[in-house]
UniProtKB/Swiss-Prot annotation:
GO terms for molecular function: tryptophan synthase activity. It comes from Synechococcus sp. (strain WH7803). It comes from the Bacteria. This is Tryptophan synthase beta chain. It is an enzyme of class 4 (lyase). HAMAP family: Trp_synth_beta (MF_00133). Pathway: Amino-acid biosynthesis; L-tryptophan biosynthesis; L-tryptophan from chorismate: step 5/5. The keyword Amino-acid biosynthesis applies.
Amino acid sequence: MTSTLPSQPSASDLAVSSRPAAAGRFGRYGGQYVPETLMPALAELEQAAAQAWKDPAFTAELNRLLKSYVGRATPLYEAERLTEHYRRADGGPRIWLKREDLNHTGAHKINNALGQALLALRMGKKRVIAETGAGQHGVATATVCARFGLECVVYMGAEDMRRQALNVFRMRLLGATVHPVTAGTATLKDATSEAIRDWVTNVETTHYILGSVAGPHPYPMLVRDFHAVIGQETRQQCREAFGRLPDVLMACVGGGSNAMGLFHPFVECTDVRLIGVEAAGDGVATGRHAATITEGRVGVLHGAMSLLLQDQDGQVQEAHSISAGLDYPGVGPEHSYLREIGRAEYGAVTDAEALEALQLVSRLEGIIPALETAHAFAWLETLCPTLSAGTEVVLNCSGRGDKDVNTVAERLGDAL
């Protein structure tokens, strides 16, 4: 399979891709299910983003900072030993890693945080709030707020703060105020709810840098477009590496921002398989999991209609994953739509499988992936035996695993 690829993308290319339909809908998913007090802020944000993408000064500044501050473009790395591990007698796929773990702050989250911080400045907002699960979005938001002199408040579940103590310290070191959230399961869902409550109260002075392709319109579109640089670079780098589009793209999915950033520039390239990997926790059959697309039903959470984990009464269920960044009972509406129309595929792997994959990649490639990313690596065990020789697979290495060392050591019985 061959394909003509675009020239090196610029920031202005990121917003050229398709918009959702009226009222921010992807099919039946998406929308704006929020208090009336937030509607003007959402309209202001949508208008500011539309104007910014048309402003050469904005895109030039974003491009400059993506290069000099974030460290883009991130490499497309051929994982030779991992490829050899999955090789069969008749050959097998070749595995490439899109190294988002090499970004400043250690994950893909900085792409969106930087773009939204620039929008906050354009809108005259001096205070920024964010939610975080694994802490990477919180760190990225605290980082850009320090860079631009913005007040930063981060909401984080108390359980996630325990699991991600290193990132909590990093946020505070960067000048952010980190509020522990003890309600509910004290994880990402509850942190998001608290951030929205803050925004409702302080909407005139505050911009909410939502960290995933979830929430009310325009956030799923906005976050996707700031992360689409991942897929744009991947297209160009694949041409340079092997002269055509990849056959398979893979990424972990919680809310789904890293996956959507990789997938979106390829959505219309129907010969390219798009595979998202969710967290099966203790196993989907146990009920202790975060496999929203695999097991969810349509509902409304945090301002958008999407697939959700729900009980028989329609109440949102608790999610479970060893990975704080995937421990969420919802998913971005565009992922729900891509699954419904058959454009993307989704699987799920357990905590134990993710731990095994993390160790395997660490020992074969000298790269310690985040626990979130390890879920995508774990799916290679299922996928690779089904692929023909010469298949080109690109996996989004969405973050590094420094933040997870204590959790992994504890689970492996080698507590630090």
